[in-house]
Amino acid sequence: FINTIRLLINKYREWKNKKDS
């Protein structure tokens, strides 16, 4: 469960990075 949350946060950060760029 925690692993999934960490993965989601990682994807969210990547998506945010791409959006900011």
Swiss-Prot record:
Molecular function terms, GO-annotated: toxin activity
Q: Which GO terms describe its cellular component?
A: extracellular region
Q: Does the keyword Secreted apply?
A: yes
Question: Which cysteine pairs are covalently linked by disulfides here?
Answer: none
- PTM annotation (Serine amide): residues: 21
Tissue specificity is: Expressed by the venom gland.
UniProt keywords, alphabetically: Amidation, Secreted, Toxin
Q: Where in the cell is it found?
A: Secreted
Principal location listed in the UniProt entry: secreted
Family, as annotated: Belongs to the cationic peptide 04 (cupiennin) family. 09 subfamily.
Query: What name does the UniProt record give this protein?
Result: Cupiennin-6c
What taxonomic lineage is listed for the species of origin? Eukaryota, Metazoa, Ecdysozoa, Arthropoda, Chelicerata
